[in-house]
Amino acid sequence: MSTRIALATYERAPGLAPDDRMLIPALERLGIRAQPAIWSDRSTRWRDFDAVIIRSCWDYHIRFGEFEAWLAALDADAIPLWNPAPLVRWNADKRYLLDLAGRGVATVPTMIAMRGHADAVESLATAEGWDRFVIKPAISASGYETFALRTPLDDASRATIARVASLGAVLVQPFADEIARFGELSFTFFDGAFSHATVKRARVGEFRVQTEHGGTVDSIVVERALIDQAAAVVRALDVRPLYARVDGITRGDAFLLMELELIEPNVFMSYAEDAADRFARAIAQRLG
């Protein structure tokens, strides 16, 4: 009997995002049957699968309570999940950046304002001397409720901060000019090994690089020193993830981490030859 795995997705992409569909034939070549399954579909019999791989679950941040319950249910049934639930829970709250900084990872400076403390956002930015800064919910994805603001704040900006702070804890970071000048680098790793790199660029008049906001993605060849710095981020974790996307900027010769994506990142397989096969081999190795 062949191995059967679920590639978890969400309701708006029941057949997976286009990039993730590349995994199905790559896994089939290794004798592994893979099919999309909507994570929130209560009719799905997850115990019928040998493992679940989180892929296009791009609504988890706005349904986080349900998502946590789904993770717990898979755990209770001892269904192998990658990335594993403890790592997913840790990565879901962007305060993980503070944890990684404490482990010696070079990150973009990050401050936290607690839920409902909108006034703390302005105080933090002012105290750090940031005349332009970015806010986002600690639990968010795809540029959700992410804004670039300037000091001194006007009434509209304060209203925006109040709305974001009402959702939960808020990340406050200095605006990275490097995003506008060059873009954001993304390094994809499968089972701890570097696969490929891409660069995401924002459209004119926008700072968010996600394609949902008009951003573009291109493949890029990066120097070994940058790959090594991105790899050090992955090595800083307590467990080696099946997949990881390390996002950040370069400042001089240094790579600064902006996000470590371990839940449902687009790993841009279509931008690198044989990337889908590398991912498939990593999955096969985990399955044993």
Residue ranges of each PLM-predicted region?
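ATP-binding N-terminal substructure of ATP-dependent carboxylate-amine bond-forming enzymes
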Residues: 1-82, 87, 95, 119, ...
